[in-house]
């Protein structure tokens, strides 16, 4: 068996595991579906056709986000963007945090900090948060939920944010999927370097970029292995967006994502 066959087999195993998880969660799906139906309001009330998605790659440190803030467009940021607050006046339309790690003790402070600093943004959270901490439903902030547990996004298929969707890989894949599902016609990527596997230390826009010497939390080989699947999801998302007439433009300088122009 060659490497390509092994790679495709891995994708099938991941997808099968996700489908099994989805079936196991069916008994509790009714509560989730009520939350997801509320996302229809996002689609109906969307004010602009363009959205800027800001990753946290080192290149974002060189972007004047104040210019983005002044554009007639919506914005979406992710994860630890709050650490960039002192560098920009940007108040994002959406703040996506999908990793259940944010519900763990060592990360909950960061989660709460983001909520405290961006009260005027709409937070987009994973429904899996509710299993770990049901109280997030009552947090004092604007929030919606997405569910990404129905298999893996291994081929272009309909994206519907009012229903349980497949898993999309890393947070930027999920952000793009959300933007497509919300009905945006033009999606612009900033700070989506997609290159952390190419450095011996962790790199982000908020902690020194390429000069940062923070210790890695996972090995280079495992991160590259994971990125191979994320790269595949980007290709599928690009094909799906194209079929809908949606433009995805990667404006990240030096980005290693090759799925978008």
Give the location of each predicted region.
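Metal-ion/cofactor- or nucleotide/acyl-coenzyme-handling active-site neighborhoods
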Residues: 2-261
């Amino acid at each position: 068996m060659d490497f390509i066959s092994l790679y495709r087999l891995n994708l099938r195993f991941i997808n099968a595991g996700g489908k099994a998880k989805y079936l196991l969660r069916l008994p509790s799906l009714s509560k989730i579906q009520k939350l997801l139906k509320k996302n229809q309001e996002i689609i109906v009330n969307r004010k602009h056709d363009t959205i800027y998605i800001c990753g946290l790659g080192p290149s974002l440190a060189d972007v004047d986000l104040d210019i983005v803030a002044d554009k007639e467009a919506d914005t979406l940021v992710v994860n630890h963007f709050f650490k960039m607050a002192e560098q920009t006046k940007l108040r994002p339309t959406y703040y996506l945090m999908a990793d259940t790690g944010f519900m763990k003790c060592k990360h909950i402070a960061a989660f709460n900090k983001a909520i405290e600093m961006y009260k005027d943004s709409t937070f987009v959270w994973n429904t899996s948060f509710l299993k770990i901490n049901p109280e997030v439903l009552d947090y004092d902030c604007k929030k919606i939920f997405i569910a990404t547990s129905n298999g893996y996004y291994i081929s272009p298929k309909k994206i519907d944010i009012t229903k349980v969707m497949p898993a999309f890989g890393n947070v930027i894949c999920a952000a793009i999927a959300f933007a497509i599902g919300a009905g945006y016609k033009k999606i612009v990527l900033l700070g989506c370097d997609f290159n952390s596997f190419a450095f011996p230390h962790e790199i982000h826009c908020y902690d020194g970029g390429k000069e940062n010497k923070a210790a890695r939390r996972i090995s280079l080989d495992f991160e590259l292995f994971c990125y191979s699947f994320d790269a595949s999801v980007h290709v599928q998302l690009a094909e799906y967006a194209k079929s809908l007439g949606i433009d995805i433009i990667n404006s990240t300088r030096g980005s290693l994502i090759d799925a978008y122009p």
